[in-house]
Protein backbone atom coordinates (compact mmCIF):
# COMPACT_ATOMS: atom_id res chain seq x y z
CA UNK A 1 0.00 0.00 0.00
CA UNK A 2 1.23 3.52 -0.66
CA UNK A 3 -0.12 7.06 -0.92
CA UNK A 4 -1.27 9.39 1.79
CA UNK A 5 -3.34 8.67 4.87
CA UNK A 6 -6.80 8.43 3.44
CA UNK A 7 -10.14 9.81 4.68
CA UNK A 8 -10.01 11.84 7.82
CA UNK A 9 -6.60 12.74 9.17
CA UNK A 10 -7.83 14.03 12.53
CA UNK A 11 -8.35 11.43 15.25
CA UNK A 12 -9.09 11.14 18.92
CA UNK A 13 -6.22 8.69 19.38
CA UNK A 14 -3.24 7.79 17.18
CA UNK A 15 -1.62 4.46 18.05
CA UNK A 16 1.96 4.16 16.86
CA UNK A 17 2.74 0.52 16.12
CA UNK A 18 0.42 -2.21 14.86
CA UNK A 19 1.79 -5.17 16.81
CA UNK A 20 -0.18 -7.22 19.32
CA UNK A 21 -0.21 -4.29 21.76
CA UNK A 22 -1.19 -1.53 19.35
CA UNK A 23 -3.87 -3.62 17.65
CA UNK A 24 -5.48 -4.69 20.90
CA UNK A 25 -5.40 -1.12 22.19
CA UNK A 26 -7.15 0.18 19.07
CA UNK A 27 -9.68 -2.64 19.16
CA UNK A 28 -10.57 -2.20 22.82
CA UNK A 29 -10.76 1.59 22.51
CA UNK A 30 -13.11 1.33 19.56
CA UNK A 31 -15.32 -1.33 21.15
CA UNK A 32 -15.64 0.52 24.41
CA UNK A 33 -15.96 4.11 23.28
CA UNK A 34 -16.31 4.50 19.54
CA UNK A 35 -13.39 6.94 19.56
CA UNK A 36 -11.81 7.62 16.18
CA UNK A 37 -8.49 5.79 16.21
CA UNK A 38 -5.63 5.71 13.69
CA UNK A 39 -3.08 2.90 13.88
CA UNK A 40 0.16 3.89 12.14
CA UNK A 41 2.30 0.84 11.37
CA UNK A 42 5.54 1.27 9.49
CA UNK A 43 5.44 -2.27 8.07
CA UNK A 44 2.71 -4.88 8.16
CA UNK A 45 0.37 -5.24 11.13
CA UNK A 46 1.66 -7.95 13.45
CA UNK A 47 4.87 -8.50 11.52
CA UNK A 48 7.28 -7.26 14.21
CA UNK A 49 8.00 -9.28 17.34
CA UNK A 50 4.41 -10.54 17.34
CA UNK A 51 4.58 -13.10 14.50
CA UNK A 52 8.16 -14.07 15.35
CA UNK A 53 7.19 -15.12 18.86
CA UNK A 54 6.45 -18.49 20.44
CA UNK A 55 3.01 -17.32 21.58
CA UNK A 56 3.17 -18.83 25.05
CA UNK A 57 0.26 -17.64 27.16
CA UNK A 58 0.65 -18.38 30.83
CA UNK A 59 -1.32 -17.12 33.76
CA UNK A 60 1.46 -18.39 36.03
CA UNK A 61 3.12 -15.02 36.39
CA UNK A 62 5.77 -14.13 38.90
CA UNK A 63 3.63 -11.46 40.57
CA UNK A 64 -0.05 -10.72 41.11
CA UNK A 65 -0.01 -8.17 38.30
CA UNK A 66 1.53 -10.70 35.90
CA UNK A 67 -0.99 -13.39 36.84
CA UNK A 68 -3.94 -11.02 36.36
CA UNK A 69 -2.69 -9.90 32.96
CA UNK A 70 -2.22 -13.51 31.82
CA UNK A 71 -5.68 -14.51 32.96
CA UNK A 72 -7.40 -11.59 31.27
CA UNK A 73 -5.47 -12.08 28.02
CA UNK A 74 -6.43 -15.71 27.77
CA UNK A 75 -10.10 -14.75 28.17
CA UNK A 76 -9.84 -11.97 25.58
CA UNK A 77 -8.20 -14.23 22.97
CA UNK A 78 -11.01 -16.74 23.34
CA UNK A 79 -13.71 -14.05 23.20
CA UNK A 80 -12.26 -12.52 20.06
CA UNK A 81 -12.27 -15.89 18.30
CA UNK A 82 -15.94 -16.28 19.17
CA UNK A 83 -16.78 -12.79 18.02
CA UNK A 84 -15.05 -13.23 14.67
CA UNK A 85 -16.41 -16.73 14.15
CA UNK A 86 -12.83 -17.93 13.69
CA UNK A 87 -10.58 -20.05 15.81
CA UNK A 88 -8.85 -18.02 18.54
CA UNK A 89 -5.52 -19.74 17.87
CA UNK A 90 -5.29 -20.58 21.58
CA UNK A 91 -4.49 -24.12 22.75
CA UNK A 92 -4.77 -24.99 26.42
CA UNK A 93 -2.23 -27.72 26.88
CA UNK A 94 -1.54 -27.19 30.59
CA UNK A 95 1.80 -25.80 31.74
CA UNK A 96 4.47 -26.95 34.21
CA UNK A 97 7.08 -24.53 35.56
CA UNK A 98 9.73 -26.84 36.92
CA UNK A 99 11.87 -26.17 40.00
CA UNK A 100 15.40 -27.46 39.78
CA UNK A 101 16.80 -25.89 42.96
CA UNK A 102 15.60 -25.56 46.53
CA UNK A 103 15.51 -21.79 46.12
CA UNK A 104 13.19 -22.12 43.12
CA UNK A 105 11.00 -24.58 44.98
CA UNK A 106 10.52 -22.19 47.88
CA UNK A 107 9.68 -19.17 45.76
CA UNK A 108 7.44 -21.19 43.42
CA UNK A 109 5.45 -22.44 46.41
CA UNK A 110 4.90 -18.83 47.47
CA UNK A 111 3.83 -17.92 43.94
CA UNK A 112 1.09 -20.57 43.95
CA UNK A 113 -0.65 -18.50 46.64
CA UNK A 114 -0.07 -15.23 44.79
CA UNK A 115 -1.62 -16.64 41.61
CA UNK A 116 -4.59 -18.12 43.43
CA UNK A 117 -5.21 -14.67 44.93
CA UNK A 118 -5.34 -13.37 41.36
CA UNK A 119 -8.01 -15.95 40.50
CA UNK A 120 -5.72 -18.33 38.60
CA UNK A 121 -6.05 -22.08 39.11
CA UNK A 122 -2.56 -23.09 40.20
CA UNK A 123 -1.09 -25.98 42.18
CA UNK A 124 2.20 -27.42 43.30
CA UNK A 125 2.88 -30.84 41.76
CA UNK A 126 5.38 -33.03 43.61
CA UNK A 127 7.74 -35.42 41.86
CA UNK A 128 5.68 -38.60 42.33
CA UNK A 129 2.50 -36.96 41.10
CA UNK A 130 4.43 -35.34 38.25
CA UNK A 131 5.70 -38.74 37.09
CA UNK A 132 2.15 -40.04 37.02
CA UNK A 133 0.74 -37.09 35.10
CA UNK A 134 3.59 -36.22 32.74
CA UNK A 135 5.78 -39.34 32.53
CA UNK A 136 7.62 -38.02 29.45
CA UNK A 137 9.43 -35.48 31.64
CA UNK A 138 12.54 -36.62 33.50
CA UNK A 139 11.40 -35.80 37.04
CA UNK A 140 14.71 -37.08 38.47
CA UNK A 141 15.99 -33.64 37.56
CA UNK A 142 13.35 -31.64 39.40
CA UNK A 143 11.97 -31.01 42.87
CA UNK A 144 8.46 -30.46 41.56
CA UNK A 145 6.63 -27.90 39.48
CA UNK A 146 3.76 -25.44 39.54
CA UNK A 147 0.93 -26.28 37.18
CA UNK A 148 -2.05 -24.57 35.60
CA UNK A 149 -4.35 -26.71 33.45
CA UNK A 150 -5.64 -23.96 31.14
CA UNK A 151 -2.35 -22.25 30.32
CA UNK A 152 -1.07 -22.86 26.82
CA UNK A 153 -0.08 -20.99 23.71
CA UNK A 154 -1.58 -19.00 20.91
CA UNK A 155 -0.40 -19.63 17.36
CA UNK A 156 1.22 -16.23 16.66
CA UNK A 157 0.16 -15.84 12.99
CA UNK A 158 -3.46 -16.54 14.00
CA UNK A 159 -3.26 -14.10 16.93
CA UNK A 160 -1.94 -11.43 14.55
CA UNK A 161 -4.58 -12.25 11.93
CA UNK A 162 -7.43 -12.07 14.43
CA UNK A 163 -6.28 -8.82 16.03
CA UNK A 164 -5.77 -7.25 12.60
CA UNK A 165 -9.14 -8.47 11.40
CA UNK A 166 -10.84 -7.19 14.58
CA UNK A 167 -9.36 -3.73 14.09
CA UNK A 168 -10.21 -3.72 10.41
CA UNK A 169 -13.87 -4.45 11.18
CA UNK A 170 -14.20 -1.46 13.49
CA UNK A 171 -15.70 1.47 11.61
CA UNK A 172 -14.01 4.08 13.77
CA UNK A 173 -10.49 2.66 13.34
CA UNK A 174 -8.20 3.29 10.37
CA UNK A 175 -5.22 0.98 10.12
CA UNK A 176 -2.44 2.44 7.99
CA UNK A 177 0.34 0.08 6.97
CA UNK A 178 3.67 1.26 5.51
CA UNK A 179 3.09 4.35 7.63
CA UNK A 180 6.17 5.23 9.64
CA UNK A 181 5.85 7.92 12.30
CA UNK A 182 8.93 10.12 11.95
CA UNK A 183 8.15 13.24 13.98
CA UNK A 184 5.69 14.11 16.71
CA UNK A 185 4.99 17.70 17.68
CA UNK A 186 2.64 19.17 20.23
CA UNK A 187 -0.09 21.46 18.99
CA UNK A 188 -3.08 23.08 20.65
CA UNK A 189 -5.31 20.26 21.95
CA UNK A 190 -3.07 17.39 20.95
CA UNK A 191 -0.30 16.17 18.69
CA UNK A 192 0.69 16.23 15.03
CA UNK A 193 2.41 13.12 13.71
CA UNK A 194 4.53 13.44 10.60
CA UNK A 195 4.37 10.05 8.89
CA UNK A 196 5.71 8.57 5.67
CA UNK A 197 2.12 8.81 4.37
CA UNK A 198 1.37 12.38 5.43
CA UNK A 199 0.31 14.13 8.63
CA UNK A 200 -2.05 12.72 11.23
CA UNK A 201 -3.48 14.87 14.01
CA UNK A 202 -4.73 13.37 17.23
CA UNK A 203 -5.76 14.52 20.64
CA UNK A 204 -3.78 11.64 22.17
CA UNK A 205 -0.95 9.36 21.11
CA UNK A 206 -0.24 5.80 22.28
CA UNK A 207 3.35 4.66 21.80
CA UNK A 208 3.15 0.90 21.14
CA UNK A 209 6.34 0.69 19.08
CA UNK A 210 7.57 -2.59 20.59
CA UNK A 211 11.20 -3.72 20.89
CA UNK A 212 12.25 -1.77 17.83
CA UNK A 213 10.18 1.36 18.29
CA UNK A 214 8.88 2.12 21.79
CA UNK A 215 12.07 3.84 22.85
CA UNK A 216 12.55 5.72 19.57
CA UNK A 217 8.93 6.91 19.37
CA UNK A 218 9.07 8.20 22.96
CA UNK A 219 12.32 10.00 22.13
CA UNK A 220 10.41 11.97 19.45
CA UNK A 221 8.71 13.82 22.32
CA UNK A 222 11.83 13.91 24.50
CA UNK A 223 10.98 10.99 26.80
CA UNK A 224 13.34 8.23 27.87
CA UNK A 225 11.58 4.87 27.90
CA UNK A 226 13.69 1.87 28.99
CA UNK A 227 12.46 -0.66 26.45
CA UNK A 228 15.31 -2.55 24.83
CA UNK A 229 15.67 -5.45 22.45
CA UNK A 230 17.68 -8.63 22.94
CA UNK A 231 18.02 -11.90 21.03
CA UNK A 232 15.57 -14.72 21.74
CA UNK A 233 15.86 -17.99 19.84
CA UNK A 234 13.43 -20.65 18.69
CA UNK A 235 13.85 -24.07 17.11
CA UNK A 236 11.11 -26.39 15.97
CA UNK A 237 11.16 -30.14 15.49
CA UNK A 238 8.77 -31.77 13.00
CA UNK A 239 7.99 -34.77 15.24
CA UNK A 240 8.73 -36.36 18.58
CA UNK A 241 10.50 -39.61 19.37
CA UNK A 242 8.51 -42.80 18.72
CA UNK A 243 5.57 -43.49 21.03
CA UNK A 244 5.45 -40.02 22.59
CA UNK A 245 2.05 -38.55 23.36
CA UNK A 246 0.97 -35.45 21.48
CA UNK A 247 0.01 -32.76 22.35
CA UNK A 248 2.04 -32.73 25.54
CA UNK A 249 1.93 -30.05 28.27
CA UNK A 250 4.20 -27.05 28.06
CA UNK A 251 7.10 -26.82 30.45
CA UNK A 252 9.48 -24.00 31.36
CA UNK A 253 12.86 -24.41 33.00
CA UNK A 254 13.23 -20.81 34.15
CA UNK A 255 16.68 -21.28 35.66
CA UNK A 256 18.07 -22.60 32.39
CA UNK A 257 16.14 -20.11 30.23
CA UNK A 258 14.27 -22.52 27.94
CA UNK A 259 10.72 -23.77 27.44
CA UNK A 260 9.12 -26.46 25.29
CA UNK A 261 5.67 -26.53 23.74
CA UNK A 262 3.87 -28.58 21.09
CA UNK A 263 4.04 -27.38 17.47
CA UNK A 264 1.96 -29.21 14.88
CA UNK A 265 2.93 -32.90 15.50
CA UNK A 266 6.31 -31.99 16.91
CA UNK A 267 7.70 -29.42 19.33
CA UNK A 268 9.01 -25.90 19.66
CA UNK A 269 11.83 -24.92 22.01
CA UNK A 270 12.43 -21.28 22.98
CA UNK A 271 15.63 -20.17 24.67
CA UNK A 272 17.52 -17.09 25.81
CA UNK A 273 21.20 -16.84 26.64
CA UNK A 274 21.72 -15.02 29.95
CA UNK A 275 24.97 -13.59 28.58
CA UNK A 276 23.38 -11.90 25.55
CA UNK A 277 23.26 -8.13 25.82
CA UNK A 278 20.88 -5.52 24.42
CA UNK A 279 21.07 -5.56 20.62
CA UNK A 280 21.50 -2.08 19.14
CA UNK A 281 21.09 -3.11 15.44
CA UNK A 282 17.47 -1.93 15.13
CA UNK A 283 16.67 -5.21 13.33
CA UNK A 284 14.04 -7.78 14.13
CA UNK A 285 16.09 -10.64 12.65
CA UNK A 286 19.23 -11.50 14.61
CA UNK A 287 21.81 -14.16 13.80
CA UNK A 288 21.02 -17.55 15.33
CA UNK A 289 23.62 -18.66 17.88
CA UNK A 290 24.22 -22.34 17.04
CA UNK A 291 27.03 -22.65 19.59
CA UNK A 292 24.64 -21.68 22.36
CA UNK A 293 22.01 -24.06 20.96
CA UNK A 294 24.49 -26.95 21.08
CA UNK A 295 25.49 -26.03 24.63
CA UNK A 296 21.90 -26.09 25.96
CA UNK A 297 20.56 -28.95 23.83
CA UNK A 298 21.85 -31.73 26.15
CA UNK A 299 19.94 -30.12 28.99
CA UNK A 300 16.51 -30.20 27.37
CA UNK A 301 17.20 -33.61 25.81
CA UNK A 302 17.86 -34.89 29.32
CA UNK A 303 14.75 -33.18 30.72
CA UNK A 304 12.51 -34.25 27.83
CA UNK A 305 14.02 -37.26 26.05
CA UNK A 306 11.27 -37.12 23.38
CA UNK A 307 13.47 -34.54 21.63
CA UNK A 308 16.72 -36.51 21.74
CA UNK A 309 18.63 -36.47 18.46
CA UNK A 310 15.74 -35.11 16.39
CA UNK A 311 16.29 -33.04 13.23
CA UNK A 312 15.30 -29.36 13.29
CA UNK A 313 12.67 -28.04 10.87
CA UNK A 314 13.11 -24.31 11.55
CA UNK A 315 15.36 -22.10 13.64
CA UNK A 316 15.17 -18.36 14.09
CA UNK A 317 16.43 -15.62 16.37
CA UNK A 318 14.59 -12.33 16.76
CA UNK A 319 14.40 -9.22 18.91
CA UNK A 320 12.39 -9.58 22.07
CA UNK A 321 11.50 -6.49 24.12
CA UNK A 322 12.41 -6.22 27.78
CA UNK A 323 12.03 -3.73 30.60
CA UNK A 324 14.39 -3.67 33.61
CA UNK A 325 11.92 -5.49 35.92
CA UNK A 326 10.17 -7.65 33.26
CA UNK A 327 6.88 -5.95 34.02
CA UNK A 328 4.91 -3.85 31.55
CA UNK A 329 4.67 -0.10 31.15
CA UNK A 330 1.15 1.32 30.99
CA UNK A 331 1.42 5.03 31.63
CA UNK A 332 0.73 8.59 30.53
CA UNK A 333 4.06 10.32 31.22
CA UNK A 334 2.97 13.48 29.43
CA UNK A 335 -0.54 14.81 29.01
CA UNK A 336 -2.10 12.97 26.12
CA UNK A 337 1.03 10.90 25.39
CA UNK A 338 0.82 7.27 26.54
CA UNK A 339 3.42 4.49 26.63
CA UNK A 340 2.57 0.81 26.36
CA UNK A 341 5.23 -1.91 26.54
CA UNK A 342 5.07 -5.60 27.36
CA UNK A 343 8.40 -6.31 29.07
CA UNK A 344 8.89 -9.33 26.77
CA UNK A 345 5.49 -10.87 27.46
CA UNK A 346 3.39 -9.27 24.75
CA UNK A 347 1.70 -12.48 23.62
CA UNK A 348 0.64 -13.59 27.07
CA UNK A 349 -0.30 -10.06 28.11
CA UNK A 350 -1.05 -8.23 24.82
CA UNK A 351 -4.86 -8.34 24.90
CA UNK A 352 -4.95 -7.38 28.58
CA UNK A 353 -2.47 -4.57 28.02
CA UNK A 354 -4.73 -3.22 25.27
CA UNK A 355 -7.66 -3.36 27.67
CA UNK A 356 -5.70 -1.62 30.44
CA UNK A 357 -4.48 1.07 28.06
CA UNK A 358 -8.11 1.64 27.06
CA UNK A 359 -8.92 2.02 30.79
CA UNK A 360 -6.17 4.59 31.15
CA UNK A 361 -7.22 6.60 28.10
CA UNK A 362 -10.94 6.47 28.84
CA UNK A 363 -11.08 6.47 32.64
CA UNK A 364 -7.72 7.92 33.68
CA UNK A 365 -6.40 4.76 35.39
CA UNK A 366 -5.67 1.12 34.55
CA UNK A 367 -8.23 -0.69 36.64
CA UNK A 368 -7.19 -3.35 39.13
CA UNK A 369 -3.40 -2.95 38.80
CA UNK A 370 -1.08 -1.24 41.30
CA UNK A 371 0.34 1.91 39.77
CA UNK A 372 3.83 1.18 41.06
CA UNK A 373 3.97 -2.00 38.93
CA UNK A 374 3.16 -0.28 35.66
CA UNK A 375 4.19 3.38 35.79
CA UNK A 376 7.21 4.65 33.91
CA UNK A 377 8.48 6.59 36.92
CA UNK A 378 9.40 3.40 38.80
CA UNK A 379 12.60 3.02 36.79
CA UNK A 380 13.94 6.42 37.81
CA UNK A 381 13.52 5.84 41.53
CA UNK A 382 15.82 4.22 44.05
CA UNK A 383 15.03 0.53 44.05
CA UNK A 384 12.70 -0.56 46.84
CA UNK A 385 14.24 -3.78 48.25
CA UNK A 386 10.77 -5.17 49.02
CA UNK A 387 9.48 -4.69 45.52
CA UNK A 388 9.05 -7.96 43.62
CA UNK A 389 10.44 -8.37 40.16
CA UNK A 390 8.76 -10.90 37.94
CA UNK A 391 11.11 -13.86 38.37
CA UNK A 392 9.19 -16.08 35.98
CA UNK A 393 10.84 -14.54 32.97
CA UNK A 394 13.59 -15.36 30.54
CA UNK A 395 17.10 -14.31 31.61
CA UNK A 396 16.92 -10.83 30.09
CA UNK A 397 19.95 -8.53 30.41
CA UNK A 398 20.15 -6.46 33.57
CA UNK A 399 20.47 -3.22 31.60
C1 LIG B 1 11.50 -15.20 19.36
C2 LIG B 1 10.47 -14.57 20.26
C3 LIG B 1 9.65 -15.37 21.04
C4 LIG B 1 8.71 -14.79 21.89
N1 LIG B 1 7.87 -15.59 22.59
C5 LIG B 1 6.91 -15.05 23.39
C6 LIG B 1 6.00 -15.87 24.09
O1 LIG B 1 6.05 -17.10 23.99
N2 LIG B 1 5.06 -15.27 24.88
C7 LIG B 1 5.01 -13.91 25.03
O2 LIG B 1 4.18 -13.41 25.77
N3 LIG B 1 5.85 -13.10 24.34
C8 LIG B 1 6.79 -13.64 23.54
N4 LIG B 1 7.64 -12.84 22.85
C9 LIG B 1 7.54 -11.39 23.06
C10 LIG B 1 6.41 -10.83 22.25
O3 LIG B 1 6.52 -11.25 20.91
C11 LIG B 1 6.43 -9.31 22.33
O4 LIG B 1 6.45 -8.90 23.69
C12 LIG B 1 5.23 -8.70 21.65
O5 LIG B 1 5.10 -9.17 20.34
C13 LIG B 1 5.35 -7.20 21.69
O6 LIG B 1 4.28 -6.65 20.97
P1 LIG B 1 4.38 -5.17 20.47
O7 LIG B 1 3.12 -4.84 19.80
O8 LIG B 1 4.82 -4.33 21.62
O9 LIG B 1 5.65 -5.19 19.49
P2 LIG B 1 5.71 -5.56 17.92
O10 LIG B 1 4.97 -6.77 17.58
O11 LIG B 1 7.15 -5.51 17.54
O12 LIG B 1 4.93 -4.35 17.28
C14 LIG B 1 5.42 -3.04 17.31
C15 LIG B 1 5.16 -2.45 15.94
O13 LIG B 1 5.50 -1.06 15.96
C16 LIG B 1 5.95 -0.74 14.68
N5 LIG B 1 6.71 0.51 14.77
C17 LIG B 1 7.83 0.75 15.48
N6 LIG B 1 8.22 2.03 15.32
C18 LIG B 1 7.31 2.62 14.50
C19 LIG B 1 7.18 3.93 13.97
N7 LIG B 1 8.06 4.89 14.22
N8 LIG B 1 6.12 4.18 13.17
C20 LIG B 1 5.22 3.22 12.88
N9 LIG B 1 5.31 1.96 13.35
C21 LIG B 1 6.34 1.66 14.15
C22 LIG B 1 6.80 -1.94 14.27
O14 LIG B 1 6.93 -2.02 12.87
C23 LIG B 1 6.01 -3.09 14.86
O15 LIG B 1 5.16 -3.73 13.93
C24 LIG B 1 8.59 -13.38 21.97
C25 LIG B 1 9.40 -12.58 21.17
C26 LIG B 1 10.34 -13.16 20.32
C27 LIG B 1 11.19 -12.29 19.46
Model-derived segments and spans:
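Dinucleotide-binding Rossmann-like beta1-alpha1 core, especially the glycine-rich loop
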Residues: 54-133, 257-259, 300
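C-terminal catalytic lobe of FAD-dependent flavoproteins
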Residues: 298-399
